[in-house]
Amino acid sequence: MVQIEKVFGREIIDSRGNPAVEVDITLVGGYFGRAACPSGASTGTHEAIEKRDGDFRFFGKGVKKAVEAINTDIRKSLLGMDSTDQPAVDNQLISLDGTDNKGHLGANAILPVSMAVARAASQALQVPLYEHLADRTYLLPVPYMNILNGGAHANWQGADFQEYMIAPVGAPDFPEAVRWGCEVYHTLKAILKKRGLSTGVGDEGGFAPKVSSNRAPLDFITEAIEMAGYKPGKDISLALDPASSEFYSDGVYELKSEGKKLSSEEMTGYYEDMVAVYPIISIEDGLSEDDWNGWIAMTKAIGKKVQLVGDDIFVTNTKRISRGISEKAANAVLIKLNQIGTVTETISAVTMARNAGWSSMISHRSGETVDSFIADLTVSLGTGQIKTGAPCRGERVEKYNQLMRIHEELGSRATYAGKKREIRHL
């Protein structure tokens, strides 16, 4: 037992220049953990609540109230607790909040405390964070690199779809996967520049050019893969996150870049046509967060051809994931810690998905910090997939760099997921 001695929260800024919460945890013996909470741009309606001040500071986005809660109520409730008992700490935080959606204290107050405790405990136990949280063989994930941005991440200046990703499934190990991704990223930049398109980057480091259709980015990326010396589909596959809740209204999906208005069935057909032409292995949030019937039909139609990842529809919430499993809506879950609010609840979500034969993908948020917690979490849980942006911008590459450090530390004890990533439905 290593008791929590000090709890301290502060306001910092994230990768978009918005306030975020950072927490320091000190244990008896001087062991220390620090963690920061990210924030999303396209957030699901059913996510845990993020508390903002709503006053004149930072146009209402300040987090002083969340920090105050950490330094008063949360501090008092955690002092003296055993830091190595993560479920007990998290259950104490959940009980203190007393709501289903973290609406009292705010997920942005609770999560960084939960993460910082885990980090401090790993230091006290003198083991790496990924080992402290681990419950299985170590698996280094396939990095899903968002190298071209559209939708809300590019201020709606180009494609309707929010993220176009590459997945180096054919790489022999994680460092090589990162190298392949970087080479494709730089090649894509040269292609866009040659065509007179913008090479400015969006929130997650991907390029954000103005394009005339949702297929154009796939053509650019496929060309970049080939020009970099790799084979599309064999070495490097593609993945999409349309974030379709952002362009869904009154039962209609409006693709403004192409002047189309589609039903759920037509949207599914739209994806099916794409999968037939391009080496797409994963589609996240292909339909809206509350279009359950559409998700069920889409899973039945194309779920054996491609991974269908639920983000906004599940929001890392076991109640919603359980419904999805029962109704066969999707076949994979995106995992974002701040959607649910504690490390323990996050692990429960991954466990539920795994027990149902579903895969999981650990994810960053568009408003990030340099905290690399999710890198360790991905390895410890063996999800085999991580989504943390382009190989650009410090808050993105820190996760990749941490995973390369873990690869180095584990040596032969680790396996790169590659084409054997934890996807059991295919």
Curated annotation (Swiss-Prot):
* Alphabetical list of Gene3D superfamilies matching this protein: Enolase-like C-terminal domain, Enolase-like, N-terminal domain
- TM spans, by residue? none
Q: How is the cofactor bound?
A: Binds a second Mg(2+) ion via substrate during catalysis.
Quote the EC number. Answer: 4.2.1.11
Among its keywords, does the record have Cytoplasm? Answer: yes
Q: Where is Mg(2+) annotated to bind? A: D241, E284, D311
For the ligand ((2R)-2-phosphoglycerate), the binding residues are Q162, K336, R365, S366, K387
Supply the SMART domains for this chain.
Enolase_C, Enolase_N
Catalytic reactions of this protein: (2R)-2-phosphoglycerate = phosphoenolpyruvate + H2O
Cofactor(s) this protein cannot do without = Mg(2+)
Q: Where in the cell is it found?
A: Cytoplasm; Secreted; Cell surface
- Listed pathway(s): Carbohydrate degradation; glycolysis; pyruvate from D-glyceraldehyde 3-phosphate: step 4/5
- Chief location: cytoplasm
Which keywords does the record carry?
Answer: Cytoplasm, Glycolysis, Lyase, Magnesium, Metal-binding, Secreted
State the family named in the UniProt similarity comment for this chain. Belongs to the enolase family.
**Can you say what this protein is called?**
Enolase 1
